[in-house]
């Protein structure tokens, strides 16, 4: 019986040794498997983020196309006329909420396009806000993004308001010439949307 017990004990010990010999290699395999799963998980997360960016870009393009259908397209911009009167800051906030800004004409072609669009979409309206002001430094006109405006189209004797009139109006009656106005005045406005 002692012999059987010894054989049994040797058998159990050899089985245990076999089990412990494979333990480090199984642990390595598990760690390697975890790394592969984590790499695949990171790759999937990256792909999902990329898809969300593409979906958001498509939504933005669709919104721009909707704006262009309701307004007009000029070069790489869409213009959309306002429905009501607002003072300068409210008008710009309204444009921003729609994905654009107050319109800033950059050349005489855009002045002509704005004049024509203004006549069609704002009949009977004499003037409307532009996204230009000199609120920071008197006489230094900046666009709504804070950049200096290089193209200016002032009417005779304008700007004339000094520190009281810091925002810029587009005048239909003066063939698209500009004048300065108190920013708290309520005026119509046109939003512009840049088409990428």
UniProtKB/Swiss-Prot annotation:
Its main location: secreted. It comes from the Eukaryota. Residues 1-22 form the signal peptide. One of its GO terms (molecular function) is carbohydrate binding. Residues 74-192 form the C-type lectin domain. It is found in: Secreted. The keyword Ligase does not apply. It holds the Pfam family Lectin_C. Transmembrane segments: none annotated. Disulfide bonds join 68-78, 95-191, 167-183. GO terms for cellular component: extracellular region. Promotes cell adhesion to laminin and fibronectin. This is C-type lectin domain family 3 member A.
